[in-house]
């Protein structure tokens, strides 16, 4: 019987520990926090979006960070396996918009309880408040880890599942990346992924709190004509810039050392010609009104003063005096408001980290290190990341399962 130490008790670490124990290993799970799954507890706004019901083959379209590396993991331990894992314990799940799967209770604590119960059932020794402060090598293998700078724990095999560097208050402080580098692994550039964006346009703060639905955004690098990212959905203005599902997904394509613009199409369902006809119809209806009072049926009230300002049409101009050229400019504006990106919000605010242990140095079919023979990795510590929708938690569980299966 091997002794296995798993570092980090997020979903990846817990699944790795459960699976390693089922494979007849003596397993210790070390967690720096005072409880299991601290970051998992806040995912999905505390409801825990645990996976997605889309066909597993579709998952890769939602994984911008090294999707090919995850083929073995996601096909070995699928979303169906995740659903069966929890439902076999009596934890009911439900699917919502976009295929996102949540516990029926809407409580992330149920998901953590399910994992915790399996840890107990499989006799995993869980050590909370146990922060790994050093890893010791001997003859090219890990011999032991130091815990809380106080004592050493020896084992035959080790799994690092410490997460990235986003949400540091949950314990994701990058310790596992530091240890991995010490062990000879390359750490790819760390960037925030799924994070709000700060905008230079001063008027944005006047729209703070406004949510725009059914819009289209396109993100451009100023050096490239083709958009880096384009999608439709929901967006939120904040005091510093923009957020919401569309922006979080789009942030994956932005770095802090480039020049980017975000174009907003407020009416993606209408062509320029169709929008022009719609505006003419409204102008005919409000023929004797001032321009500022003619857009109520077309745009959110809070947005109208900004559109008027950007259109350079006098707010007091009668709509029957607005000429064709002005109307054309208004159409182009509504179909293409340009936001100038200042920077991404800090990595601490990101939902996940882009970057991590280089996937070229990990066997994708086992999660084993190609450098250290008694080491595997699982979860966000690896250079993989996905969009929101349950994909990141599924990746954590799938890589954890592979790592635990191959100790």
Model-derived features: positions:
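An anion/pyrophosphate-binding glycine-rich loop and adjacent beta-alpha core
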Residues: 34-36, 41-42, 50, 56-57, ...
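Glycine-rich active-site loop/strand segments that organize a redox cofactor
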Residues: 47-95
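N-terminal Rossmann-like FAD-binding beta1-loop-alpha1 element of flavoenzymes
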Residues: 3-29, 403-407
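Glycine-rich loop(s) and the adjacent beta-strand/alpha-helix scaffold that form part
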Residues: 157-203
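Short hydrophobic core segments
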Residues: 5-7, 30, 132, 152-168, ...
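A glycine-rich dinucleotide-binding beta-alpha-beta segment and adjacent secondary-structure elements
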Residues: 127-129, 134, 305-385
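Glycine-rich FAD pyrophosphate-binding loop
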Residues: 21-45
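Feature captures the FAD/FMN-dependent oxidoreductase FAD-binding
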Residues: 76-157
């Amino acid at each position: 019987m091997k002794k296995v130490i798993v570092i980090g008790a997020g979903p990846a670490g817990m699944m790795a520990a459960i699976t390693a124990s089922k494979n007849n290993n003596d397993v210790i799970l070390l967690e720096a926090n005072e409880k299991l799954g601290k970051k998992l507890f806040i995912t999905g706004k505390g409801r825990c979006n645990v996976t997605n019901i889309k066909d597993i083959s579709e998952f890769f379209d939602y994984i911008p960070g090294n999707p090919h590396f995850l083929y073995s993991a996601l096909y070995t331990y699928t979303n169906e396996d995740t659903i069966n894992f929890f439902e076999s314990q009596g934890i009911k799940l439900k699917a919502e918009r976009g295929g996102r799967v949540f516990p029926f209770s809407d409580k992330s604590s149920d998901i953590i309880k399910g994992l915790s119960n399996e840890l107990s059932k499989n006799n995993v020794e869980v050590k909370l408040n146990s922060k790994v402060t050093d890893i010791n090598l001997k003859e090219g293998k890990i011999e032991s880890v130091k815990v809380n700078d106080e004592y050493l724990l020896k084992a035959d095999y080790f799994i690092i599942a410490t997460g990235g560097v986003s949400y540091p208050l949950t314990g994701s402080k990058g310790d596992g990346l530091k240890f991995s580098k010490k062990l000879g692994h390359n750490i790819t550039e760390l960037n925030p992924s799924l994070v709000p964006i700060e905008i230079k346009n001063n008027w944005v703060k006047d729209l703070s709190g406004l949510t725009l639905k059914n819009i289209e955004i396109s993100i451009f690098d100023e050096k490239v004509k083709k958009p880096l990212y384009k999608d439709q959905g929901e967006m939120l203005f904040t005091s510093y810039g923009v957020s919401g599902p569309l922006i979080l997904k789009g942030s994956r394509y932005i770095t802090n050392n480039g020049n980017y613009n975000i174009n907003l199409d407020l009416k993606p369902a209408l062509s320029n010609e169709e929008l022009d006809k719609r505006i003419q119809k409204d102008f005919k209806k409000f023929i004797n009104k001032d321009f500022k009072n003619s857009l109520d049926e077309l745009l959110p009230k809070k947005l109208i003063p900004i559109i008027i300002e950007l259109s350079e049409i006098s707010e007091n101009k009668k709509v029957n005096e607005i000429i064709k050229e002005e109307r054309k400019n208004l159409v182009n504006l509504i179909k293409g408001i340009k936001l100038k990106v200042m920077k991404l919000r800090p990595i601490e605010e990101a939902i996940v980290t882009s970057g991590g242990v280089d996937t070229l140095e990990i066997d994708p079919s086992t999660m084993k290190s190609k450098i250290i023979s008694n080491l595997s990795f699982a979860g966000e510590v690896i250079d993989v990341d996905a969009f929101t929708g349950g994909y990141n938690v599924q990746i954590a569980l799938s890589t954890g399962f592979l790592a635990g299966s191959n100790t």
